[in-house]
Amino acid sequence: MVRPGLRSRSLRRVYRRTPGGSTVVHYERRKPGPARCARCGRPLGGVPRGRPPRVRRLSKTAKRPERPYGGVLCSTCLAEMIFEAIAGSS
């Protein structure tokens, strides 16, 4: 029987083939969902999906796009906000 802590479905099962030819089950934490745009809710491109310790090891530029509101707004919403700001100021 598997350990009680590993019976939870919050852990995903990964099947690994060992060098001896048998298949064993490894239990891993699931990946979090994708980062989403704060305005429209679409998944953000260029933002990695990963557990915090894995993402922490990435370089700063690998964590989010290098533009204003990168990692917060999608490019479409950012373009709309810039356009609204320019149109509203004149």
UniProtKB/Swiss-Prot annotation:
Single Gene Ontology MF annotation: structural constituent of ribosome
One GO-annotated biological process of the protein: translation
Database matches in InterPro entries: Ribosomal_eL34, Ribosomal_eL34_C_sf, Ribosomal_eL34_CS, Ribosomal_L34e_arc-type
This protein's UniProt keywords: Ribonucleoprotein, Ribosomal protein
Protein name: Large ribosomal subunit protein eL34
Family: Belongs to the eukaryotic ribosomal protein eL34 family.
Region (Disordered): 38-65
Pfam families in alphabetical order: Ribosomal_L34e
Gene of this entry: rpl34e
A cellular component annotation (GO) from this entry: ribonucleoprotein complex
